[in-house]
């Protein structure tokens, strides 16, 4: 018989007692009453918060949206077919958050901040709640720095400033996304982080956008947030808020971010779907009563912070898709009233080969003028006036009236200006080149050149300026203002180049 050592047993027991931890896992639970169409009704979560993240079985998450007397209505962020009646549901006691920070740059993520580009996990150390209060009046300062898009028509006549909300509105297939991509590509070499949020779009379209950004080297400073057409409505509803939370990280860390929401019409439709399934009362066009607040609380988070808060900025470019140019529908009028201006794109202009198809007559930027560079401001006023007079005369000339010489000259000038405002896709122009061509156009140097040669004149003027007068372009870039001395240099370049151009293209002119 083995000898039993009492001291050894005592020490083992003492060691076990010391290592024993008394921990009770307490969690508030409820049970699923019914589930369907991405909505679950839950009984038992009495202390749940509005917008709180809820844990369902099979790693499915949900958000509490309807807090009723005897039940909670929650939207599911995963496959709702895995959930059944009677399943246990747990509170997390935290509001829905997404990962933010440098680790997301160059990545494609879903509305929950999870990577979907196959490049491995994102090692984010910080999380931001998707719903946050917008900065107050005291924390802001007026928009004063330009956010150059590289598009002549926008930077000259509808300028966008850092911290502004500028709506891009138009029918489908009028070039809305192209303007946003140009704006992203134009930030290359700058200090801006760009976030592109795709809401309810085809996956093939999003893949094309990502490829375009990669081909132009823009993914190095961009983040793409995707809630595609095949994703559930709650994911489409969350996507812009997630994109905004990611942008706010850069805004609050004394940096600058641009957030593009493509588009908020589909976002409103997803919210309408959720609201109707949650049995909320419908209003105009079956949208819920708080659809205005849905977009206003999102877009108000774009801001230019004051110096005490780091002077960072978040610029928003929301998109709205209209039906047959109807801007008086519910969602378009809502978003127009929330934003600081709008860029109207028209199908007729697009089809008549004027691209970007911006109707500068009804497009406006309410605060961007304060952010415009002095150089652009000095020449853009004349451009807008000339185009306004041209549109008025063009409408009058349709009646076949005989026009006097000054009116004919005005029509001719307008035709040339419309031509130089055309621009190829994904070819954003730096400020100095925009200044050169717009100055030449508004001062009448293109008036005697055939309209069909305007684009050739423009391309060759850029080449000539770069090769023979690079210091002048650099001076415009650094000064950002046209003083008399610099204006004289620009005039000299344009006159010298025009002489050469007219000599080379004299046969074409005579033929024209």
Curated annotation (Swiss-Prot):
GO molecular function, one term: ADP binding
One Pfam family linked to the record: ATP-synt_ab_N
Keyword field contains Cell cycle: no
Chief subcellular location: membrane
Similarity section: Belongs to the ATPase alpha/beta chains family.
Stored PANTHER family: ATP SYNTHASE SUBUNIT ALPHA, MITOCHONDRIAL (PTHR48082:SF2)
Role this protein plays: Produces ATP from ADP in the presence of a proton gradient across the membrane. The alpha chain is a regulatory subunit.
Enzyme Commission no: 7.1.2.2
The species this protein was found in: Solibacter usitatus (strain Ellin6076)
Gene3D superfamilies named among the record's database cross-references: 2.40.30.20, ATP synthase alpha/beta chain, C-terminal domain, P-loop containing nucleotide triphosphate hydrolases
Feature type site, description Required for activity: 363
Protein name as annotated: ATP synthase subunit alpha
Bilayer disposition of the protein: Peripheral membrane protein
Subcellular location: Cell inner membrane
InterPro entries, A to Z: ATP_synth_asu-like_sf, ATP_synth_asu_C, ATP_synth_asu_C_sf, ATP_synth_F1_a_nt-bd_dom, ATP_synth_F1_asu, ATPase_a/bsu_AS, ATPase_F1/V1/A1_a/bsu_N, ATPase_F1/V1/A1_a/bsu_N_sf
Any one GO CC term of the record: plasma membrane
């Amino acid at each position: 018989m083995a000898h039993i050592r009492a001291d050894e047993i005592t020490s083992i027991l003492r060691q076990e007692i010391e290592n024993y931890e008394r921990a009770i896992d307490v969690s508030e639970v409820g049970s699923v009453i019914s589930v369907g169409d991405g909505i679950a009704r839950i009984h038992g979560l009495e202390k749940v918060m509005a917008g709180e993240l809820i844990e369902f079985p099979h790693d499915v998450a949900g958000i509490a949206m309807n807090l009723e007397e005897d039940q909670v209505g929650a939207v599911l962020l995963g496959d709702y077919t895995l959930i059944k009646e009677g399943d246990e549901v747990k509170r997390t006691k935290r509001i829905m958050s997404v990962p933010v920070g440098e680790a997301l740059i160059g990545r494609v993520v879903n509305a929950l901040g999870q990577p979907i580009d196959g490049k491995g996990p994102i090692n984010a150390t910080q999380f931001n709640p998707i719903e946050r209060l917008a900065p107050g009046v005291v924390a802001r300062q007026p928009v004063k720095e330009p956010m150059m898009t590289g598009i002549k028509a926008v930077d000259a006549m509808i300028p966008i400033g850092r911290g502004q909300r500028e709506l891009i509105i138009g029918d489908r297939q009028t070039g809305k996304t192209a303007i946003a991509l140009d704006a992203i590509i134009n930030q290359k070499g700058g200090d801006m982080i760009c976030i592109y949020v795709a809401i309810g779009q085809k996956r093939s379209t999003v893949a094309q956008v990502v490829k375009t950004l990669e081909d132009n080297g823009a993914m190095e400073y961009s983040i793409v947030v995707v809630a595609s057409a095949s994703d559930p409505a709650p994911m489409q509803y969350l996507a812009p808020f997630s994109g905004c939370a990611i942008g706010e990280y850069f805004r609050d860390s004394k940096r600058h971010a641009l957030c593009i929401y493509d588009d908020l019409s589909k976002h409103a439709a997803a919210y309408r779907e959720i609201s109707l399934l949650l049995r909320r009362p419908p209003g105009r066009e079956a949208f819920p009563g708080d659809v205005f607040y849905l977009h206003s609380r999102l877009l108000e988070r774009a801001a230019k912070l004051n110096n005490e808060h780091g002077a960072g900025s978040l610029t928003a470019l929301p998109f709205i898709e209209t039906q047959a140019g109807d801007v008086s529908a519910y969602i378009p009028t809502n978003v127009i009233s929330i934003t600081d201006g709008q860029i109207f794109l028209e199908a007729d202009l697009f089809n008549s080969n004027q691209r970007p198809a911006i109707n500068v007559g009804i497009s406006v930027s309410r605060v961007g003028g304060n952010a415009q560079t002095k150089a652009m401001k000095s020449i853009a006023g004349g451009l807008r006036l000339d185009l306004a007079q041209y549109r008025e005369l063009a409408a009058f000339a349709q009646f076949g009236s005989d026009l006097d010489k000054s009116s004919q000259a005005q029509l001719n000038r307008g035709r040339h200006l419309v031509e130089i405002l055309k621009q190829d896709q994904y070819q954003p122009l730096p400020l100095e080149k925009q200044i050169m061509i717009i100055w030449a156009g508004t001062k009448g140097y293109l008036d005697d050149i055939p309209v069909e040669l305007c684009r050739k004149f423009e391309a060759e003027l850029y080449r000539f300026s770069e090769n023979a007068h690079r210091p002048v372009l650099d001076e415009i870039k650094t000064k950002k203002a046209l003083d008399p001395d610099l204006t004289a240099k620009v005039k000299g370049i344009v006159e010298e180049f025009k002489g050469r151009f007219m000599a080379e293209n004299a046969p074409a002119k005579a033929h024209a």
